[in-house]
Regions:
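Glycine-rich segments within core transmembrane alpha-helices of 12-TM secondary carriers
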Residues: 49-76, 307-315
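A late C-terminal transmembrane helix in Major Facilitator Superfamily
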Residues: 291-326
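Hydrophobic core of transmembrane alpha-helices in multi-pass small-molecule transporters
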Residues: 2, 15-32, 262-279
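Extracytoplasmic gate region of multi-pass secondary transporters
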Residues: 167-209
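Cytoplasmic helix-loop-helix junction between adjacent transmembrane helices
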Residues: 21-60
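Helix-to-loop junctions at the C-terminal end of transmembrane segments
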Residues: 76, 220-236, 323
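C-terminal transmembrane helical hairpin of 12-TM major facilitator-type secondary transporters
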Residues: 233-283
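C-terminal membrane-cytosol helix-exit motif in multi-pass small-molecule transporters
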Residues: 72-73, 96-120, 345-348
Length: 357
């Protein structure tokens, strides 16, 4: 519905219809925050497969980050001389059709996990052993019940997080927010920067191709991350991704300061940012799910997704205003966010150790 409203704004000649369409789409896409919980759901995913599954999700994320800008720029370039379906409205109509087909497949083939199904490895679902008695009992009259799984009506024991677990939670939420803040900021800033810089003078088509090219070239490395995730600790993946992205930000800042920014150097910085923070975002939900009881999966996934959405929304606003506020200030804030995360990371290094995979 949001895409249809967005695409109808051109024909209706009503600017605020674009805003209304984006708001409706935002409400709809906010429900996607629940998809990551399936990467750490103990009922279907073991501890040693959660980072791998989250890496698969990031591969799809990278594919969308590449295909979306390229398709948008290509449709703008083609144009279509039509007041309803043209270079501005065609992405909205096409996405509305794609989502319609998607939901048909969901209705036909998707099966959700029963709510009453408990995770077999949930420590909160294990009942304490009962003391034995010397009094004889009639086994035929006793009800048959699995001794390790309590009735669904039994209240779960209260779990209290330790100080270390609180620290890990804050660290993972911070990196989830920072990664999506920087990715969203760069995606919204590059078209504005390219159009404002005389050396580039990008059209929407050229800006879309630039963003897509950076995403496509990171794709093989995201596949490698998927393969190595089973044999690498989450904290090492986080350290590599955040360090790569941080280095790219420092190089970009030095290029802006020296006024030596060109197409090649800008591309390498965008590539480093896209790869680094996409890789860093793979371990946030998996690390947190390994630190806390399986019964907390919904809470941990929501905490990470709220952080992702906070970063994505504020990052897009910050990136769009980057040229107006000054590119040095724009990059400086991103470096500061990563720096704060690095301090948390170093203090919690030993507490971030989890099972691989």
């Amino acid at each position: 519905m949001g895409h249809i409203l967005y695409a109808s704004a051109y024909r209706a000649n009503y600017l605020y219809l674009i805003l209304i369409g984006r708001i409706v789409s935002g409400f709809g896409f906010s429900l996607w925050m629940y998809c990551k919980r399936y990467c750490s759901d103990p009922r279907i995913v073991g501890v040693r497969r959660r980072t791998t599954l989250a890496s698969c999700l990031v591969v799809g994320q990278g594919l969308g980050m590449s295909l979306g800008p390229f398709a948008g720029g290509l449709l703008y370039k083609i144009g279509f001389s039509n007041s309803i379906f043209n270079g501005f409205t065609s992405p909205g109509w096409i996405m509305a059709a794609i989502w319609s087909v998607f939901w048909i497949f969901v209705i036909q083939f998707y099966e959700d996990i029963p709510i009453d199904q408990r995770g077999f490895n949930d420590p909160s679902s294990v009942a304490p052993s009962t003391p034995t008695s010397n009094n004889p009992t009639n086994e035929k009259d006793a009800p048959v019940r699995d001794p390790t799984i309590p009735p669904l009506s039994a209240p779960l024991p209260k779990y209290r997080m330790s100080h270390a677990q609180w620290g890990v939670t804050i660290c993972m939420c911070w990196f989830a927010m920072t990664s999506f803040f920087i990715l969203g900021a760069w995606e919204s800033n590059l078209p504005v920067l390219g159009a404002d810089t005389p050396k580039f003078h990008w059209s929407p088509f050229a800006a879309g191709n630039f963003i897509a090219l950076g995403g496509i070239t990171t794709f093989p490395f995201l596949i490698l991350n998927l393969l190595f995730a089973r044999r690498t600790q989450d904290r090492h993946i986080l350290a590599f991704g955040s360090s790569l992205g941080f280095s790219a930000l420092l190089v970009f800042l030095s290029l802006l300061r020296s006024q030596k920014l060109n197409y090649g150097s800008a591309f390498m910085c965008w590539w480093g940012v896209a790869l680094g923070f996409n890789v860093a975002s793979t371990v946030t939900i998996s690390t947190l799910s390994k630190q806390l009881p399986p019964s907390w999966n919904n809470r941990t996934s929501l905490a990470i997704q709220y952080s992702n959405y906070t970063g994505r929304v504020t990052g897009a606003i910050w990136g769009g205003a980057g040229v107006h506020l000054g590119m040095m200030n724009y990059v400086g804030l991103e470096i500061a966010l990563v720096g704060i995360g690095s301090i948390l990371f170093m203090f919690l290094w030993h507490d971030l150790k989890t099972k691989m995979g």
